[in-house]
């Protein structure tokens, strides 16, 4: 900007003129984009990787004067059909210019596990996605097949940036996806149910893992919840989204009911699992990068 001599003199005399800081200790919160839920009774998307130094074991970083780059990860796009969900993209805080170093990278959340093995297995990411499902066998009550959720904290960071997804389930007369992992805890598993004829046996979908709270902006906000799994059976429950913005999974049948719910914007939360091309999965929520400078400045 341009200031007159009078405005500069006045600001300096009042102590309000900006001063250069040679270096400063910066606290950060870097959350990647969340993964989308999978299609067709799929698993919920995993939350984006969650890395912070504020009131956490990780140390603040010291920055000197210079240019820095910030990349905020996008959420994975929604899915219709039987395929896996899409992963979120990474959020990055790094030095620009000739320094060119990356200081903090949070990994995108995993896309939910879809239908039919081997694609039904959950995927790995900042937080892992819920395991998917595959079509049921004959009616009747019998053992259910578990489909593993994906691993969180992939690649590994210390402290951990995320948690695992819950397993999906193929029951004799119904399938359901597992919940995506959240920043606070793992995604919930799908659970087999015993029902009267003609349903016999189905499955309730897993809930998304809880997010994690931070007060880096001055008030406590929970972010990065996992997405809930979807369910096939008409009398079974879809998975709730994890606290902090995770999307709920789709429930069948669908007249008048919504598709899988998207993760909340700027929380890096996972999207809920979908049902079919008419009722797609929920998209993952975009991430966020927050920097807290000395005093009360928040970027």
Each model region followed by its residue ranges:
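Low-complexity, glycine/proline-biased repetitive segments and flexible coils/loops
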Residues: 1-14, 23-299
């Amino acid at each position: 900007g341009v200031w007159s001599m009078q405005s500069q003199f006045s600001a300096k005399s009042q102590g309000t003129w900006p001063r250069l800081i040679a270096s400063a200790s910066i606290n950060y919160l870097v959350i990647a984009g969340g993964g989308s839920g999978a299609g067709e009774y799929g698993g919920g998307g995993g939350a984006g990787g969650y890395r912070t130094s504020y009131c956490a074991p990780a140390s603040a970083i010291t920055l000197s004067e210079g240019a820095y780059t910030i990349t905020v990860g996008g959420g994975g796009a929604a899915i219709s059909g039987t395929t896996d969900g899409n992963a979120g993209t990474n959020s990055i805080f790094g030095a620009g210019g000739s320094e060119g170093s990356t200081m903090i990278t949070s990994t995108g959340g995993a896309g939910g596990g879809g239908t039919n093995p081997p694609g039904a297995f959950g995927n790995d990411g900042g937080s892992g996605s819920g395991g998917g499902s595959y079509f049921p066998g004959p009616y009747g009550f019998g053992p259910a097949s578990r489909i593993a959720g994906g691993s969180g904290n992939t690649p590994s960071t210390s402290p951990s940036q995320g948690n695992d997804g819950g397993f999906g389930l193929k029951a004799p007369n119904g399938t359901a996806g597992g919940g995506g992992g959240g920043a606070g805890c793992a995604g919930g598993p799908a659970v087999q149910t015993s029902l009267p004829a003609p349903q016999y046996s189905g499955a309730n979908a897993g809930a998304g893992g809880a997010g994690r709270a931070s007060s880096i902006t001055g008030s406590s906000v929970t972010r990065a919840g996992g997405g809930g799994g979807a369910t096939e059976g008409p009398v079974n429950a879809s998975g709730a989204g994890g606290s902090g913005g995770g999307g709920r999974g789709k429930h069948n049948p669908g007249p008048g009911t919504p598709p899988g719910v998207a993760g909340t914007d700027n929380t890096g939360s996972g999207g809920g699992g979908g049902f079919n091309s008419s009722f797609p999965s929920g998209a993952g929520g975009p991430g966020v990068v927050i920097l807290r400078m000395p005093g009360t400045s928040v970027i």
